[in-house]
């Protein structure tokens, strides 16, 4: 039997064991939680300053690093992402002018989405914003805020982060991007109140306000349904049943005609063209002649300047 001293040692050892066990459990929980709670974006950032002369390019090296960190460390939503679920995207800023700490240029934004049961990735977004202007001084911190507009630069970064997340969500579930689209509305409203360029409704058919409207206005909201039908019921199905998946894609394209009838110049139409036209050539390369002609007829009405690619689709070629 244990002596009094021995009993105290036993109790102490038990407490130490329990303490160590508790620490291990907490550590495992934290490690597991951090794995589940990965940030949403896996973003490559590139800044091109070839058009500039007599400028300290270190300014843009610093900005590029800050933007990369901003996109890849900010938690934009409360959703849980595994590391392999992060959205792959690219952000290209081409600087045309930098005077008095004001950057002017354009931004190309791209994002991709994996296709189920395959190694294939599909382009979800490929858009050029031609009206970009913001103030920036080297070393200026980029601060994420939800309910206020910190400055024009972070407003632009937030807009495209949420736009990428919104489109991605819609491709996986019907209106799966609802929360992100709500954030986009708030960002646009705050930016419009600031008077900064690139945000005003009706100012430009392809500015940030127009991008939001292309997916949230009643007359063009079919674009959101198309995102789900095209990707989740179409592309994701093709690698199991090519004919069935392709049929769903064909059905989804009717949304484009609805948008065209409502607004032939709507930015949703050019977004689809820039992201999907090459892909469609490959999708229909093994379709029947009747199916190819049906799709080509629709696309030629929407995109009369793209007849080279549309004729490739019609002929059953593969890119």
In which residue ranges do the predicted regions lie?
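Sec/Tat signal peptide C-region and signal peptidase I cleavage site
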Residues: 34-38
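Positively charged n-region of N-terminal signal peptides that target proteins for export
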Residues: 12-21
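Sec-dependent N-terminal signal peptides
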Residues: 4, 21-30
């Amino acid at each position: 039997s244990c002596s009094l001293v021995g009993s105290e040692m036993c109790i102490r050892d038990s407490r130490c064991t329990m303490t160590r066990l508790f620490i291990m459990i907490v550590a495992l929980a934290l490690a597991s939680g951090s794995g589940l709670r990965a940030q949403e974006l896996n973003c490559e950032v590139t800044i091109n300053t070839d058009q500039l002369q007599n400028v300290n390019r270190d300014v843009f090296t610093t900005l590029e690093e800050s933007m990369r960190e901003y996109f890849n460390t900010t938690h934009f939503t409360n959703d849980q992402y595994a590391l392999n679920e992060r959205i792959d995207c690219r952000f290209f800023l081409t600087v045309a002018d930098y005077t008095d700490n004001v950057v002017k240029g354009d931004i190309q934004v791209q994002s991709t989405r994996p296709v189920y049961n395959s190694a294939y990735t599909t382009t979800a977004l490929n858009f050029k914003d031609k009206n970009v202007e913001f103030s920036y001084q080297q070393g200026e911190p980029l601060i994420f805020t939800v309910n206020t507009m910190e400055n024009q630069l972070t407003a632009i970064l937030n807009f495209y982060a949420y736009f990428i997340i919104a489109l991605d969500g819609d491709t996986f579930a019907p209106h799966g991007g609802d929360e992100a689209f709500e954030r986009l509305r708030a960002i646009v409203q705050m930016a419009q109140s600031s008077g900064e360029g690139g945000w005003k409704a009706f100012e430009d058919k392809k500015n940030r306000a127009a991008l939001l409207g292309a997916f949230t206005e009643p007359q063009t909201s079919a674009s959101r349904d198309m995102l789900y039908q095209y990707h989740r019921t179409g592309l994701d199905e093709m690698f199991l049943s090519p004919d069935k998946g392709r049929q769903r894609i064909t059905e989804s394209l009717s949304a484009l005609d609805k948008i065209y009838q409502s607004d032939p110049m709507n930015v949703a139409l050019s977004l689809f063209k820039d992201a999907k036209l090459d892909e469609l050539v490959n999708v229909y390369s093994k379709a029947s002649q009747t199916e190819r002609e049906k799709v080509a007829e629709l696309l030629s009405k929407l995109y009369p300047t793209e007849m080279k690619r549309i004729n490739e689709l019609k002929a059953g070629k593969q890119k």
